[in-house]
């Protein structure tokens, strides 16, 4: 279940923008509209996005769509563009990275996924997991000197050399 999505420099969003599914203290229709996670976090099952025409409602949904596309895409071309579209109505932002941060629960466990990229390159991708009150880095890839470094937290996830090599061959420069 999604907790929140933060985006920056994506489509019509120049500044950081957040959509949160965390529920308020209101208890109206709590049983049918909310989910309470094991750690006590209350999440709304639904969200309503409203606003004036051309205010970014569709582009906020496009942020979710972009992440799903990014995760599912298959490419044998390690130099393939990322497909991200930064905010273009400012002279500085097209050359600055686009940022995504998705907080979510999967099978009752909290994760934070972070993605920083340009139209050409994936600059950083991180996945944190909460096994306690503090997040632990599970996976990190980043672009260093035009090459991508991929690291797994071996104390949390056992990744064989063969699997790491296969992942590297598929998605790294």
PLM region descriptions:
Residues 2-66:
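Pre-Walker A-like glycine/lysine-rich segment at the N-terminus of P-loop NTPase domains
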Residues 17, 23-25, 91-93, 143, ...:
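Solvent-exposed, flexible loop/coil residues
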